[in-house]
Structure formats: C-alpha cells, structure tokens
Amino acid sequence: MLELAHKLADSDTKFFGGWVLAGVEAHIHGQANQLENRVLLEKERKCIIQVRGTTLVAGAEQLVKELRVFLVLPKNKLGTKTIEPGAPTGKLLVEHTFTVQEVRDYVAYTGDENIIHQGEHPIVPGLCMAAWLQQALQKQELDWRISFLTPVYTGDELKIYATEQELAAYVGSTKVFLIKL
C-alpha cells in the first residue's frame, strides 16, 4: 500500500493544496515490478487518480496492484460538517493513536505534501491509516473499497471494528471511515 501511495505522490502538485481523500479502491495481489499513475477524471472540485502495479508473468504484463483514489476539493472548511454519532457495531479488532511524527514519516516517505497533513495537529492521511491497518491485520493481499467520512487528526484514538462484510473505523462514537470487503 505504501509503495502505491508513494507513486500517487508523483501526480500533479495541484492535488496537494487542500484536496481531500473521499474514497479509495485498493487491490493488492502480488509484488509489482513497475508502477505508473494517471489521472482518470479531472474536474474543478473532484478527480480520480489511478496507480497501477504490474509484473511480467510468462512474458505478459499482469496487473497485480491497483489503487484508485477519489479526491475532492471541499467548499467548506474541514471539520465543519456535522456527523451524527452512533454506537460502533461488530468486534473490536485494533486501535491506534497516530502521532505527529508518524504523519511526518509517512509524508517524508510518500511525498504527500498536502497542506492538511502539516502543522502541529495535522489530519492523518487516509492512505497512511489504510497502510497501518493493512500491516496491523497482516494482509498481504486485499480488495478494499474505502469511504472516508470525516477527518482523523493526530492524537485521536482510532478503533477498528469488524463485521462479516466491512470494517468500520471510529473516533469516539463518530464513524470516520468504512471499508467494504
């Protein structure tokens, strides 16, 4: 996941000036020898960027990793939208509190220099949380469709709950992202 996020940072720098990750589709089924990215859709306030990872199998190029990110440029200041709290459901799998240093390390590795991930109380990058979760769950292969609902800031205690068909992340009683399995 981290190598896909690193390649994503090769995208046009205009997408790092306050754009927000609204959703991700991630498929990982092996090691890639080559990564490439391209913009699939670009509009005034939304875009879709794809990162593809391929390898040669019996002389033919085979897709083994793919990341599609849906970015939006919000009209309102982040954190101003009211989210209805709800009780988490499912089994608690893991929990983690991201630090400013973890975000800095992620930004340094991937090159994701979006202004929202900087400062003394930055927003934790969505792909940073996804990569942490992939590692925490020890997933070598995955097919995830992630919807990011509200920002997670450093210092927030993130808890991941599992049901049969999804993983839900909460900060307190607020659902912050959802992963369809």
Q: Locations of the language-model features?
A:
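Hot-dog-fold acyl-thioester-processing enzymes
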Residues: 1-30, 72-143
